Amino acid sequence: MKLFIDTANVDDIREVASWGVLSGVTTNPSLVAKEGRDFMQVLREILEIVDGPISAEVISLQADDMVEEARQYYELHKNIVIKLPMTAEGLKACARLSAKGVRCNMTLIFSPNQALLCARAGAAFVSPFVGRLDDISTDGIQLIRDTAEIFDLHGIDTEIIAASIRTPGQVVEAAKAGAHIATIPPKVFHQMLKHPLTDSGIERFLKDWEAAKGRV
């Protein structure tokens, strides 16, 4: 399973990219607004850091407007992926953009039916929201599992991005359920680094090393 980072913070992207684990980036209007910066400039900086799919989300609600808004993004670089909402208008825009060879990431997926519609509209990626389903006592990982089963059964090439990830455990479960990608907030990336036995093991190695030096 590939790992994307879900943020518009360039410093966070640069930090996690330095670990050698990133394959792409996802953003959304809320993340962009949080940074308070010009989005086109942010995209240019991200493109210099990560050589992989970079999802840029439109804010328009009508298909014609979505397609027009998307142009400024996909003309910027071949790695830009257009992120569209799972609506009838979003599907129309996806079909039109995909026909031009523009990759689309359909977001706000909460059912296998929605994922299937997006795949048939030509989406390169679908983004089921794990955490938000868990918030309403629904099994978000089961959505990943069901979608992966349908795609495998029918030879659908659309990649599944496990989104709305809240914990390291959800990353593992998404991988086991068949997600091709997990898009992960910076905070969860840092949590994935940690284990108490790793910390205590490093501390013990250092103590043993110092003790050995003292005996020389």
From Swiss-Prot:
Keyword annotations: Cytoplasm, Pentose shunt, Schiff base, Transferase
Top enzyme class: transferase
Keyword presence, Cytoplasm: yes
Compartment(s) where it occurs, according to its Swiss-Prot or TrEMBL record: Cytoplasm
Active-site residues, record numbering mapped to chain: K83
rRNA processing in keyword set: no
PROSITE patterns: TRANSALDOLASE_1
Enzyme Commission code(s) on record: 2.2.1.2
Domain of life of the source: Bacteria
GO MF term (any one): aldehyde-lyase activity
One GO-annotated biological process of the protein: pentose-phosphate shunt
Pathway: Carbohydrate degradation; pentose phosphate pathway; D-glyceraldehyde 3-phosphate and beta-D-fructose 6-phosphate from D-ribose 5-phosphate and D-xylulose 5-phosphate (non-oxidative stage): step 2/3
Disulfide partners: none
Catalyses which reaction(s): D-sedoheptulose 7-phosphate + D-glyceraldehyde 3-phosphate = D-erythrose 4-phosphate + beta-D-fructose 6-phosphate
GO cellular component, one term: cytoplasm
InterPro entries hit by this protein: Aldolase_TIM, TAL/FSA, Transaldolase_3B, Transaldolase_3B/F6P_aldolase, Transaldolase_AS, TSA/FSA_arc/bac
Similarity section: Belongs to the transaldolase family. Type 3B subfamily.
Role this protein plays: Transaldolase is important for the balance of metabolites in the pentose-phosphate pathway.
Protein name: Probable transaldolase
Organism: Symbiobacterium thermophilum (strain DSM 24528 / JCM 14929 / IAM 14863 / T)
